[in-house]
């Protein structure tokens, strides 16, 4: 832990744990609006299985993308917990941004980007930027943070979700 943003966030959280901090009404309202937007996206009725290349899937194995596009009927049904997991991630992102703001950490908010690759355009929306670098908010266990997300090398060596490709796509766009 040595990045100034991380230090500021930990200080803010320490203050909160010791009843020494408050949240502005503006920040609380923004967190609520962000969660409302996430609910609208998750329960908006759009078919999330329609295939298209997007930043969130470009790092996945090519064979998985091929099957997603050409044989979607062979996919296993999504578990009933899928939408809840997506919602928890959206809530974590909304609260995290509120914490950053209250800790005095400057960050760039979500932005939609497009990357032209050959004849295709890949679209996506990244979570935030800190110090001009694209970053992605993840909800994960303490074990995951210590063992999976500890460094770029650790993440790249054992990740099956395409996080590295996703971040490279956002940063390149």
Spans of features found by a protein language model:
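Metal-dependent nuclease catalytic cores that hydrolyze phosphodiester bonds in DNA/RNA
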Residues: 1-134, 141-157, 161
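An active-site-proximal "capping" alpha-helix that borders the catalytic cofactor pocket
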Residues: 163-173
């Amino acid at each position: 832990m040595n990045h100034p943003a991380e230090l500021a966030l930990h200080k803010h959280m320490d203050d909160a744990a010791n009843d020494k901090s408050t949240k502005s009404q503006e920040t609380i309202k923004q967190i609520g609006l962000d969660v409302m937007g996430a609910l609208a996206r998750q329960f908006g009725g759009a078919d999330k299985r329609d295939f298209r290349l997007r930043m969130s899937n470009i790092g996945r194995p090519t064979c998985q993308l091929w099957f997603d596009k050409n044989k979607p009927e062979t996919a296993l049904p999504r578990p009933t917990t899928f939408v809840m997991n997506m919602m928890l991630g959206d809530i974590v992102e909304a609260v995290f941004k509120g914490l950053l703001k209250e800790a005095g950490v400057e960050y760039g908010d979500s932005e939609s980007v497009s990357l032209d690759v050959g004849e295709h355009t890949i679209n996506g929306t990244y979570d935030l930027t800190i110090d001009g670098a694209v970053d992605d908010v993840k909800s994960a266990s303490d074990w995951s943070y210590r063992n999976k997300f500890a460094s770029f090398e650790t993440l790249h060596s054992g990740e099956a979700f395409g996080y590295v490709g996703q971040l490279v796509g956002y940063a390149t766009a």
